[in-house]
């Protein structure tokens, strides 16, 4: 391993003009891999729509929308709910749901902090390989 990075380095291989050989051996933690078979449908749809491979941040956004949708179902809010009440009920509902997302299994603690496990990847031959 040449260097180690956090999830913020996910997507480094897709940076325009980046010499991917410079990332060879990079170890990083990320909850998403575009090369994971379980994400194949999302990756294809994303590539068809945007012409590039999605990174963790695209997957986080996708999971975030689905998490809010699940929390809305859990809270059972009517369309005309007061925004302050909606916020309180959604905050409570988030602590009761589990979402199977592109970035893994997501749960929220009583402070509203998401809980999910990252996976270690190494860049080898220009690809993310699970470490």
Would you name each region that the model predicts?
Residues 1-131:
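Extracytosolic ligand-binding ectodomains
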